[in-house]
Amino acid sequence: MQTTIIKWHNIVKTIAILILLSTVFSACQKNFDNQQVPNTEESANGAAAAANAKGLEQTVSTNASKEAAAIGFTETSETDFEKGPKKNIVQIAIANPHFSSLVAAVVKTGLAGALADSSAKLTVFAPNNDAFAQLPAPFNNATNITAITSAANIAFLKSVLLYHVLGTKVKANQIADGRSSVTTIKPAGTSNDNTIYFSKTYNFIRVNGNSDVIFANIKASNGVIHVINKVLIFPTKTIAEIAVADSTNFSVLVTALSKTNLVSVFTSGGNFTVFAPTKAAFAQLPAPFNNAANINGITNTTQIAALANILKYHVVPSRYFAWDLGVFKRVTTLATAPNNKITTILGYNNGWVRGDANNMYSKITPADVLATNGVIQVINKVLLPL
């Protein structure tokens, strides 16, 4: 039986050692600010290493074992799956009380038959009850889900469930290391709204940037189940639509995109990562780049061209979740070469990014805002190229 509990402590130790070995000279960094990385690369390296080692050990080692135990699966339970004839996916879910919300959702949406189909070979990323509890009512527990009568809510819930299912059997070791993606059986509504994205490092698998596989490879007669700790919600808006809808944070960014005729980049199809500066981030720049009114009033073509290049410096033509950012990884943007690379630092809780002309790292928070054409990483400083 290849059922595998993610080896959290080994992952923690491996990542911590790899990071700390590259930063021995600054490992004694004492003044780490959780909201801001120091203004030199050396101290930033030490701070990042300390943050990652501490954050991974405290967060992963403390919570992962609890999550695996909470859903009733432990290493000793592996042999239990080998006893007697295998159950189908629905039967396995029904047999475990920690999947009661999932079972209620499957029944409410009429998907029990499809997920129990003996001729199918499916992969289900199965959220446990704790994952559903993070959703707003009426999707947050079995009782509320069972009571749903709204046709719109039922249709939405059905789409969400289908977004967790692959039409083929895929074991954890068949998911490629690094970044990859796969199409689910959810019918496509808009571009990429039925695709899920994997970030895999040292057998640790994260889906869509925020949902961890906490127990993998539960064999069923008609496929395999991977247990996850957050419900996957498919994207419905483009990067531009998300920015326009959040005027509190992104009104200056939207104005800048309009002034430079770059809105089409953020509405087009494809996969982009946008490091999106907030209104407060722009306010730190000198005039006329410091607010929407001043940007809208720019007429100097040289200034408009410079602003356009700065905005392109925030766009990576590939989808990077925070977990995909390496230690001082150089990432190529859409800005004019050769000064078109930014530096990123992995953070278990988000991460940091710096432009070559910045003397401070920008904190990514919030991270991994999923869009149909990419992902948004919200940052608190504008990135500046040389």
Language-model features: where?
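Bacterial N-terminal signal peptides that target proteins for export
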Residues: 3-15
